[in-house]
Amino acid sequence: MSTTGPQDAPTHWRGILRHLGPGLIITACIVGSGELIATPMVGAEYGFSLLWFIIGGCMIKVLVQVELGRFAISKGMTTLEAMNTIPGPRLVVSWLVWCWLFMFVGILFQLGGIVGGVGKVVAELGWFAGFGGTGVFTIDRLIALVVSAVTVAILASGKYKPVELFSIIMVVLFVVATLFALASLQWSPEMAAHSISWGDIREGFQFRLPGDFSTAFAAFGIIGVGASELIYYPYWCLEKGYARNVGTPNPTNVWYRRTQGWLRVMRIDACVSMVIYTGATVAFFLLGAALLHGTSGVSNETMIADLSKMYAPLGEAGLTIFLVGAFVVLFSTMVTASASNARLLADGLVLFQLKKPRSEKERAKLLSQCCIAVPLVCAGVYLFVGAPVSLVLVGGVAQALMLPFLAGTALYFRYKQTDKPLQPSKVWTALLWVSAIAMAAVGLFQFYKKLT
């Protein structure tokens, strides 16, 4: 992070590389429950035919992500502060911030499901088979408590750098684990029956839609950048120092030129992360299509176990590597999502006037307290509710319902709040409309499904 005043953005790739980071944190957050559970489920149900849909679902939402980041960097405002400027009814805060609060509660349930998923994956490894009891003291619940405690230890300082470093390590690990999982299908004689052919890939790009589209449409709300990650991203851009490097908004040519430079860095950061999480998501989809399509009894509840059993022909080592990869994916989401939601909680408490920090030191203390509280609350949710996949789906529905509002917010910022020199091109704007319409359609579909 920058510790100085305004400075011009780097133009050489080495300098740009040093300033990447927010997107990697989001990537570590994204490749989690949606990719490990929902995406293979789409492959299991529809085979390879929806590969194009999975790729599009990952790529299209990045336009809204960049637009929210553009506003944060140019105005120096957090996402909730930005949402609080949206016109409409107010009760202490904007109606849109109240919508976020509903989603936030759903996300706490989702994180409870994720920490439970980590517990179940570690339990599957069998390393702690002699531990645990009954009721709330089963092995998966005890592991969930330990995972939450480790998460608190990583995040307790409330600082940016530990989260970025952790995210980079996790991204490297789950990319390696995913490549192993796919490579074993292609080159291991024991897995030859499940190998993926070019014919399978061609089938995935015939742009066909199945008659019953519900599972795929539900997955669209979770895969790639979900509503929560769209809200998280500007926070990490601010903490990385993009807005500080831009300086106080000042409608001069020098300021606009400097801002355009840092917006370019932000776009590169977002696109690099998109390439990584799209690749990982596609890999999980291909695993589901290759290993589980056409099998009976596949469900969300048993997805990880079903996938892991398919690797039994590789022996103990292959199964262990797959489960370790699943652990890395879920644990990275737990840590980075907890860090992100802690920032939202601290910001929300201030906006709702429940906390009034009088200095940066007091605000940092509040953030540290929230970094401790969020993982512990999520562990409590899993201990007393259980059913990790149901908890994950509650958060997924809450996020999907928020997507139309975020799509509209991005368009509002584009047309009403962005200075003309900083506005995107006509092509970008057209793609932004496509992205916003697709996101709104997903949210409305989820709402309809719940009503019926």
Regions found by a protein language model. Name each.
Residues 1-35, 94, 242, 260-272:
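Membrane-interface "cap" regions at the ends of multi-pass membrane proteins
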Residues 2-5, 39-41, 66-92, 122-130, ...:
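Flexible loop linkers connecting adjacent transmembrane helices
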Residues 9-12, 47, 74-105, 136-137, ...:
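Transmembrane-helix boundary/entry motifs in multi-pass membrane transporters
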Residues 14, 43-66, 92-95:
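Extracellular loop-to-transmembrane helix junctions
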Residues 26, 53-85, 102-112, 336:
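Juxtamembrane transmembrane-helix boundary signature
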Residues 93-132, 330-348, 388-390, 440:
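Hydrophobic transmembrane alpha-helices that form the core helical bundles
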Residues 126-156, 170-183, 361-379, 403-412:
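Transmembrane alpha-helical segments of multi-pass small-molecule transport proteins
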